[in-house]
């Protein structure tokens, strides 16, 4: 190889000398290692530029200094290149090569790859063929290229298509190496992209065949896509384009995109290449040859420097191209790692494993009509920047073809055109949007390189454009105008969208473009697709709330009707119904009504109804009558509707009312003379539009004034309106209406609800005299005809604030709206009036018939209830006797007389004289075989022969005092009622209830079976009548009184009593809280505390009654009271005492003298302050006397009592309230204090007797000062006691101490200390609750040892079952206890007064059976001979002793202290609250 003349020139050697001198100087100055690098320039290259590039001091900072060898050569054949490089290695000891050529031969790259692999020398191809794409490099090669890889170029080609929305394409390749990589890269990219790519064809052309063009033509004819990607060499591309041109694939409508391999040298362009060819090439404009040489030297030097820094050596120079040693291989591989990762001057110059740059500088070039390559885009940092926002469709000059691809300009203005950014993930536009280009104006860019970014457009006009393009069948490129707005002629030149169309840069202009005459002169407009004009927008002003806004929900008529119905109608109606109701407050139906009690006034009625309107937020008093309750309930429903309607409608009137400053139009004074207002009225518009033109042509002064207030855009104008910088904005009506509808907070409105001035329309601007106008007009008219235009208007032009006031604001509720509520109140009043009339008719006329009084048979209500019960339980109804003849019948079943009867019963229990004497009662208790009905405590006596006892005759005035009490109570009763009472008592000795006997008398009735069931009696208020005897009569004193206790409340002797009345307001509070405790606490106790029991009368009332009777002077026993039908009523009471056939006479004992003396003593005791307990001291004289013994001998009526019994009875060591024995009281003390021993209580009774911290047994406070008797007589009536001052004072002090029943608190505490039995109530659902430990356990099982009452002797032998807790009972068909002593539903005589006095009302007689009293406490065995000891204690003139009950006396049944303690007398242990009215307090 001969050196060229250029290489031997003096200039060349001068350069080498300079380099040598500089290198030696550097080595002398700094002993740094150097590396030899050969720079080979093939072809024509600028040596001076290269010299300037590597002579700079840019590499002095590196640890290795480059030693550059500049070589120029012209030969490009492989042999010359190989020889020259090998000579340099052997002569110059080079360690790297940088090669640049100006050819398009990709073979040079292949030669360099071969040399590098053989010599293990790094070679860099920086330009020309050496930098072209090369596939399948040698693995040991260190050949690197300044150029993009195949994959990188394929990615850039896809980005170009995506930029212009070219999604449909095909691929054409040859068998040139790397085609498979190219196709695979395209396929993998489109498969993993969000863009909707569509690859139609992939053609592989075999260029080695010599069969002509026919085969290639046939293959190219398959292509139908407008975009074609070509991969081949430059020579192959020349032939392919020639064939493609012959088949029409290079004309208008087809775009070819090729890599840099096809473009090659940009200075030579083959004639076969079509105009508009796009190529991806290495940047030749910004990255020239000198910069590449410099970077090549820097890459090798930097890599060697990094290697020296880490390993302290650099590769040794190569002396020959042959015989490579292993050490050289190791050093070269190590240097290769540093060459791949190089950063120089902050630029990343790294290479990939394939030897291509990681970040190449690429450009997109276009072959223009001048047949020159034009740079139209740049790829930098994986971002594409294109010059043309619409791709120029370039075609040959000779081709005349109709253009169906249009360039369209638009303007951003919502809602007609809305511009958005592309999707950040896919980089494309989403659905229902159209790609549009937006130009970026920058001062740093030249006019030749404008920047554009891709945007997405949508809106009303865009949807119209899409529909028109489908109908007319054309494609388009959309871009946004930048030089102006809609278009205005300035100095004879149009700008904006009109200017783009006039300059023919766009075929059409679509947007909010108003049609006017000036624009129509230069462009053609389509028919208007929307009507518009000029409108004015203002800001709403904040109003104030009216003071009467709270009244606005209802009209004045509704408010008037509200108060009329409340004050006049509803309140008055409730008051009248309540006042005249049978159970109202002001109806004095009972004498016991408290004076000054509550009354339901008209004011309370108004207050009640007014409180209901506001949800009972104030304390009110509720009515009691049924009619008034109905009226109040309906009013409550009315109040709910009224208040809910008011509240719901109030929100619409309480919000701020907004007012709009009205402007009549453009001729308004505020527009024509704005300075006349203070402050001046400010208004403006957007310049360069049809609105400004219209104002300028019609209102010159207005146009001159508004110039300083004009806005740059609609958004700026809206902001100025909200901030107060602008008072009115004049613009297109369509745009303003949309903005007003979409305004946040709806603060902006158009005057006159969108009033339009200078009406016109929006149209599409088309180039003048274009053939597209007619087709576009027809397409728009078709949209109107199909209704699609209305759909688009509803979609885009309707805002949320449109008609807002009509939707939110509610109208006033007039009388028609509220008429239904007032109709409801009227109907309620009518119904209440009918109910009121029916209530009175039933109460005064039909009530007795329903209760069976009229027919004498069971009432309808009773029959229905008993029939249902019988069907369920299989109990037959036996109507053998009239229900009114039953002993359980009542004298009057009305609630109105209950309180009167209760008071009468108490008065009768406290009567003086004959009625208070126990003598007559004792006459009946004979020693013969008579049976006293102790179970029901009635005067029902029979002999063993089932014959009734014949009462002896009585005196005429026997019941005068008693009848006077009855006359005072029942004086107004009709005659038929009296007959009912008399018939009732005639059958009293043989009582029968429906289906069974209700007395022990039935057990000895020869006509009845020995044992029958006892179904529940009628639910009435039975009234059993007992008659007191005369003072001198031989008849017994009738103990029984008017009992108001029904069958359901009579119970076992040992058990706690249930309630005493059937009154619905009575609520039993059971003392036993065992069992289902949770249920009782939540239901029974809770309900009992809410309701008001009948027996809970005010203690003050009882105290007044008792004190009144104490103050009454004693009446003469002969005092007569005359009343209607007195003789018949006397016969009614005397009938029971007349002697009957076959009955033994009773022995009469005259105790007149005893009671006479007692009467005198009582008078003296009452004067001296003797209490009710001290008068019992007359019965005992000294310590040697027995209790109840006259002269040391038992009284005649106590002949059968044994001494043991008398000791137990009279010992005085038992509590007066319970059978507990008092161990701390001896017989001696008891004998000395016999007058007080009846009042002694045990500690438990003392504790339970406290009521609100008031001691019940105040008489025990003076027990430490006993008063012994001073005289002893054989007759009890002559006993005298000294009245010491202390004792008299104590008696006087204790005289007014009124005893109280146990309160709820003490009762519960008592139950906690001493457990009581289970409650007396039971129901089917509580069956399981009472299976154990309950008197009702016998209802579900039959013990084997139960004996029946089939024989007569069972009366005296079966009595031990009565008090034996472990005894069982025979199972019967009834749900109630079999024995009358166990039945809690049988009424008793005298229980009413015992309820009031707290005493026990049972008379006991000691049985004649020997040892019976000593062996067991047989209750029935005690019937015959038990004396009424308390009768002697209570012999008080003028009234009964209120402690006449035997519960205060000694009980022969010695109790077990472990058993439950009995309560005082017949006190049932319940809590009775005050009863202020009789009817149900529901």
Swiss-Prot record:
Phosphorylated on tyrosine residues. Phosphorylation at Ser-1303 by DAPK1 enhances synaptic NMDA receptor channel activity. It comes from Mus musculus (Mouse). This is Glutamate receptor ionotropic, NMDA 2B. The keyword Membrane applies. GO terms for molecular function: calcium channel activity; glutamate binding; glutamate-gated calcium ion channel activity; monoatomic cation channel activity; NMDA glutamate receptor activity; zinc ion binding. It catalyses: Ca(2+)(in) = Ca(2+)(out); Na(+)(in) = Na(+)(out); K(+)(in) = K(+)(out). It holds the Pfam family Lig_chan-Glu_bd. The chain crosses the membrane at residues 558-576, 631-646, 818-837. InterPro entries: ANF_lig-bd_rcpt (IPR001828), Glu/Gly-bd (IPR019594), Iono_Glu_rcpt_met (IPR001508), Ionotropic_Glu_rcpt (IPR015683), Iontro_rcpt_C (IPR001320), NMDAR2_C (IPR018884), Peripla_BP_I (IPR028082). Residues 1266-1277 have a biased composition (Low complexity). The modification Phosphotyrosine is found at residues 962, 1039, 1109, 1133, 1155, 1472. Residues 577-603, 624-630, 838-1482 are cytoplasmic. Residues 604-623 are annotated as: Pore-forming. Detected in brain (at protein level). Detected throughout the brain, and in brain stem trigeminal nucleus. Detected in forebrain. It is a multi-pass membrane protein.
């Amino acid at each position: 190889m001969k050196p060229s003349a250029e290489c031997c020139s003096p200039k060349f050697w001068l350069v080498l000398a300079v380099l040598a001198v500089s290198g030696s100087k550097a080595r002398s100055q700094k002993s740094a290692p150097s590396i030899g690098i050969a720079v080979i320039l093939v072809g024509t290259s600028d040596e001076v530029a290269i010299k300037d590039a590597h002579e700079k001091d840019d590499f002095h900072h590196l640890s290795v200094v480059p030693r550059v060898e500049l070589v120029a050569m012209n030969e490009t054949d492989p042999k010359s290149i190989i020889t020259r490089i090998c000579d340099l290695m052997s002569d110059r000891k080079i360690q790297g090569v940088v090669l640049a050529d100006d050819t398009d031969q990709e073979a040079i790259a292949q030669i360099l790859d071969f040399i590098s692999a053989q010599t293990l020398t790094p070679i860099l191809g920086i330009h020309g063929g050496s930098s072209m794409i090369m596939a399948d490099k040698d693995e040991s090669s260190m050949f690197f290229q300044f150029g993009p890889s195949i994959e990188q170029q394929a990615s850039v080609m896809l980005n170009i298509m995506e930029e212009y929305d070219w999604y449909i394409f095909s691929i054409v390749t040859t068998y040139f190496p790397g085609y498979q990589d190219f196709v695979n890269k395209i396929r993998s990219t489109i498969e993993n992209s969000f863009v909707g790519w569509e690859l139609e064809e992939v053609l592989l052309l075999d260029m080695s065949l010599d069969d002509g063009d026919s085969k290639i033509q046939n293959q190219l004819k398959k292509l139908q896509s407008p975009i074609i990607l070509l991969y081949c060499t430059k020579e192959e591309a020349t032939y392919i384009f020639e064939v493609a041109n012959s088949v029409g694939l290079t004309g208008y409508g087809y775009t070819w995109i090729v890599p840099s391999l096809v473009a090659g040298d940009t200075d030579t362009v083959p004639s076969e290449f079509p105009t508009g060819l796009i190529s991806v090439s290495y940047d030749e404009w910004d990255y020239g040859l000198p910069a590449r040489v410099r970077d090549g030297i820097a890459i090798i030097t930097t890599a060697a420097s990094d290697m020296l820094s880490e390993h302290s050596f650099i590769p040794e120079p190569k002396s020959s191209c042959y015989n490579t040693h292993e050490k050289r291989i190791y050093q070269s591989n190590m240097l290769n790692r540093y060459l791949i990762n190089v950063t120089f001057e902050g630029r990343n110059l790294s290479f990939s494993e394939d030897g291509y740059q990681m970040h190449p500088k690429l450009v997109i070039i276009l072959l223009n009509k001048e047949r020159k390559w034009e740079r139209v885009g740049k790829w930098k940092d994986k971002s594409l920047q294109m010059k043309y926002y619409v791709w120029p469709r370039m075609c040959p000059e000779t081709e005349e073809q109709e253009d169906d691809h249009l360039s369209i300009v638009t303007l951003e203005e919502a809602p007609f055109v809305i511009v958005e950014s592309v999707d950040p993930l896919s980089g494309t536009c989403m659905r229902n949007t159209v790609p549009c280009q937006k130009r970026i104006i920058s001062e740093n860019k030249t006019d030749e390189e404008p920047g554009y970014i891709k945007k997405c457009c949508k809106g009303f006009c865009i949807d119209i454009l899409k529909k028109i393009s489908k109908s007319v069948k054309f494609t388009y490129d959309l871009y946004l105008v930048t030089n102006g707005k809609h278009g205005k002629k300035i100095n004879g030149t149009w700008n904006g969208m009109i200017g783009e169309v006039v300059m023919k840069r766009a075929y059409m202009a679509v947007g909010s473009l108003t049609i006017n005459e000036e624009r129509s002169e230069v462009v053609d407009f389509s028919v208007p697709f929307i009507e518009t004009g000029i409108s004015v927008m203002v800001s709403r002003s904040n109003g104030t709330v009216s003071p009467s806004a709270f009244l606005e929900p209802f009209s004045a008529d509704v408010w008037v009707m509200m108060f009329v119905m409340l004050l006049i109608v509803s309140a008055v109606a409730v008051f009248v119904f309540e006042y005249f109701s049978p159970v109202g407050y002001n109806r004095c139906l009972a004498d016991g009504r408290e004076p000054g009690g509550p009354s339901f006034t008209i004011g309370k009625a108004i207050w009640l109804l007014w409180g209901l309107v506001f949800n009972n937020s104030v304390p009110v008093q509720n009515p009691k009558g049924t009619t008034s309750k109905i009226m109040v309930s309906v009013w409550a429903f009315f109040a709910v509707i009224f208040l809910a309607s008011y509240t719901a409608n109030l929100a619409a009137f309480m919000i701020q009312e907004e007012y709009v400053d009205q402007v009549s139009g453009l001729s308004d004074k505020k527009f024509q003379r704005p300075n006349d207002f203070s402050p001046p009225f400010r208004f403006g518009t957007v310049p360069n539009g049809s609105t400004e033109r219209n104002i300028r042509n019609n209102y010159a002064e207005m146009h001159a004034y508004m110039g300083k207030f004009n806005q740059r855009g609609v958004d700026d104008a809206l902001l100025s309106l909200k901030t107060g910088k602008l008072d009115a904005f004049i613009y297109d009506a369509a745009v303003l209406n949309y903005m007003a509808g979409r305004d946040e907070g709806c603060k902006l409105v158009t005057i006159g609800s969108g009033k339009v001035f200078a009406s016109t329309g929006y149209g599409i601007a088309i180039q003048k005299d274009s053939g597209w106008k007619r087709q576009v007009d027809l397409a728009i008219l078709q949209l109107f005809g199909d209704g699609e235009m209305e759909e688009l208007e509803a979609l885009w032009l309707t805002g949320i604030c449109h008609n807002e006031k009509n939707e939110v604001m509610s109208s006033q509720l007039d009388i028609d709206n509220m008429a239904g509520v007032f109709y409801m109140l009227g109907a309620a009043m009518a119904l209440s009036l009918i109910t009121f009339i029916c209530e009175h008719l039933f109460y005064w006329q039909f009530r007795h018939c329903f209760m069976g009084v009229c027919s004498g048979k069971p009432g309808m209500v009773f029959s229905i209830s008993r029939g249902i019960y019988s069907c369920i339980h299989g109990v037959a109804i036996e109507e053998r006797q009239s229900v009114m003849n039953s002993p359980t019948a009542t004298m009057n079943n009305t609630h109105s007389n209950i309180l009167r009867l209760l008071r009468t019963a108490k008065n009768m229990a406290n009567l003086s004289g004959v009625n208070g004497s126990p003598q007559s009662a004792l006459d009946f208790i004979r020693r013969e075989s008579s049976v006293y009905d102790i179970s029901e405590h009635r005067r029902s006596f029979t002999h063993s022969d089932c014959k009734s006892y014949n009462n002896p005759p009585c005196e005429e005035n026997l019941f005068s005092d008693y009848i006077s009490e009855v006359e005072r109570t029942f004086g107004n009763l009709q005659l038929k009622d009296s007959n009912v009472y008399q018939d009732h008592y005639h059958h009293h000795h043989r009582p029968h209830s429906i289906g069974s006997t209700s007395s022990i008398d039935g057990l000895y009735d020869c006509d009845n079976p020995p044992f029958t069931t006892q179904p529940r009696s009628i639910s009435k208020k039975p009234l059993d009548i007992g008659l007191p005897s005369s003072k001198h009569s031989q008849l017994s004193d009738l103990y029984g009184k008017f009992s108001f206790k029904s069958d359901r409340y009579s119970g076992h002797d040992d058990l706690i009593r249930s309630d005493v009345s059937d009154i619905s307001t009575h609520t039993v509070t059971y003392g036993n809280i065992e069992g289902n405790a949770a249920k009782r606490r939540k239901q029974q106790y809770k309900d009992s505390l809410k309701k008001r029991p009948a027996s809970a009368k005010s203690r003050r009332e009882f105290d007044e009654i008792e004190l009144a009777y104490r103050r009454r002077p004693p009446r003469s026993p002969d005092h007569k009271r005359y009343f209607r039908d007195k003789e018949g009523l006397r016969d009614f009471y005397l009938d029971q005492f007349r002697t009957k056939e076959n009955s033994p006479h009773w022995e009469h004992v005259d105790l007149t003298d005893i009671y006479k003396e007692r009467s005198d003593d009582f008078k003296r005791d009452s004067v001296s302050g003797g209490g009710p307990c001290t008068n019992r001291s007359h019965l005992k004289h000294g310590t040697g006397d027995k209790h109840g013994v006259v002269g040391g001998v038992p009284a005649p009526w106590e002949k059968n009592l044994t001494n043991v019994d008398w000791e137990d009875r009279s010992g005085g060591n038992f509590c007066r309230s319970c059978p507990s024995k008092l161990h701390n009281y001896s017989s001696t003390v008891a004998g000395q204090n016999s007058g007080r021993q009846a009042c002694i209580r045990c500690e438990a009774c003392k504790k339970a007797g406290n009521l609100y911290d008031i001691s019940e047994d105040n008489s025990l406070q003076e027990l430490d000062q006993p008063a012994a008797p001073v005289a002893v007589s054989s007759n009890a009536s002559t006993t005298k006691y000294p009245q010491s001052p202390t004792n008299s004072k104590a008696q006087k002090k204790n005289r007014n101490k009124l005893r109280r029943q146990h309160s709820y608190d003490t009762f519960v505490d008592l139950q906690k200390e001493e457990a009581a039995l289970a409650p007396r109530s039971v129901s089917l659902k509580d069956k399981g609750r009472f299976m154990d430990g309950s008197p009702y356990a016998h209802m579900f099982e039959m013990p084997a040892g139960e004996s029946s009452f089939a024989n007569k002797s069972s009366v005296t032998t079966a009595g031990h079952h009565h008090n034996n807790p472990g005894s069982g009972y025979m199972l019967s068909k009834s749900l109630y206890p079999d024995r009358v002593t166990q039945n809690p539903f049988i009424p008793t005589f005298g229980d009413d007064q015992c309820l009031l006095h707290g005493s026990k009302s049972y008379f006991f007689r000691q049985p004649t059976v020997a040892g019976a009293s000593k062996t067991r406490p047989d209750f029935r065995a005690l019937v015959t001979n038990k004396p009424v000891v308390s009768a002697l204690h209570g012999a008080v003139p003028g009234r009964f002793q209120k402690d006449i009950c035997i519960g205060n006396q000694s009980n022969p049944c010695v109790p077990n202290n472990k058993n439950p303690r009995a309560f005082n007398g017949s006190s049932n242990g319940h809590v009775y609250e005050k009863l202020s009215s009789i009817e149900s307090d529901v």
